[in-house]
Swiss-Prot record:
Pfam families from the UniProt entry: GHMP_kinases_C (PF08544), GHMP_kinases_N (PF00288)
The protein's name in its UniProt record: 4-diphosphocytidyl-2-C-methyl-D-erythritol kinase
EC number(s) reported in the record: 2.7.1.148
Coiled-coil region list: none
Length: 288
């Protein structure tokens, strides 16, 4: 039996961290959405109890370091399942880019195995299990515009974003999320994004309010080490994006445009400066 699951990339329209838990986990306050740049995850039953991971990327491990592998282990343990699976991942999302590719692949594994093994778990349970793999997995289980709080485990769906176009641009660097998070100093955070105003803008479908209140508290940390991030951000705004910022821990920067024609111009202009550029739209996975 074979199951195929789509694993969309995510971006952070708003990203704030409020404090650190005693175990080192961050307390998050984020607004996230998924876009139509996606990996595809194929699951095949095995006659043995093995977990096999096959990818078309030379940058990904195929053992227990892979988040998709970990997702299988968590689900097997929770449901007391003794079955094997081969996971084939067709990558489109750049690796170590701040776009949640590994987490989305892991979430796709949870959704797909839930179907393949007839486990009948709801998305809330899958999201709770996903937190054992990575803090972005609970959101990626849903993969729809949402307000994400707690350790990443409290996912509150939001209305669809108003129609907009998004230009993603990844500089030629890869970022280690743990390294960036270790550098967070709460006493030195000068400016927190106004997440409440961003949420209000989405509720009201108000472009100006959304664009004015986007923000990522981690951007200064990553950009200090990788100045290319601010260069790309400036280029996005110069070429006509309505707003621009870094996604996640970076290094991918995205610009947003209300109109497709302007987004296409920004995309075409940026292609001359950055090799990995994508023109995408917001997507809610449950609509496909």
């Amino acid at each position: 039996m074979q199951i195929v699951e789509k694993a969309p990339a995510k971006i952070n329209l708003g990203l704030d961290t409020l404090f650190e838990h005693p175990n080192g986990d961050k307390e998050w306050d984020m607004v996230m959405t998924s876009v139509d740049l996606a990996d595809y995850v194929m699951l095949e039953s095995l006659h043995t109890n093995r977990i096999e991971v096959v990818t078309d990327s030379g940058f990904l491990p195929n053992d227990r370091r892979n988040l998709a592998f970990q997702a299988v282990s968590v689900l097997k343990r929770y449901c007391h399942v003794d079955r094997g699976v081969r996971i084939k991942i067709r990558k489109a999302i750049p690796v170590a880019a701040g776009l949640g590719g590994g987490s989305s692949d892991a979430a796709a594994v949870l959704r797909g195995l839930n179907r393949m093994w007839n486990l009948h778990l709801d998305l809330a349970t899958l999201a709770r299990l996903g937190l054992q793999v990575d803090s972005d997995v609970p959101y990626c289980v849903y993969s729809q515009t949402a307000h994400v709080t707690g350790k990443g485990d409290v996912v509150t769906p939001l209305p669809k974003l108003p129609p907009m176009w998004i230009i993603l641009a990844k500089p030629k660097v890869s970022v280690s999320t743990p390294n960036i998070l270790r550098q967070v100093n709460y006493e030195r955070i000068d400016q927190h994004p106004n997440i409440e105003a961003l949420l209000a803008g989405i509720q009201q479908q108000d472009f100006a309010e959304i664009f004015a209140n986007m923000g990522n508290v981690l951007e200064p940390i990553t950009a200090k080490r990788y100045p290319e991030i601010l260069q790309i951000k400036r280029q996005l705004l110069t070429f006509g994006a309505d707003a621009a910022q870094m996604s996640g821990t970076g290094p991918t920067v995205f610009g947003v445009c209300r109109k497709q024609s302007r987004a296409q111009r920004v995309y075409n202009s940026l292609k001359g400066f950055c090799r990995e550029v994508y023109l995408v739209r917001p997507v809610n996975l449950n609509e496909h």
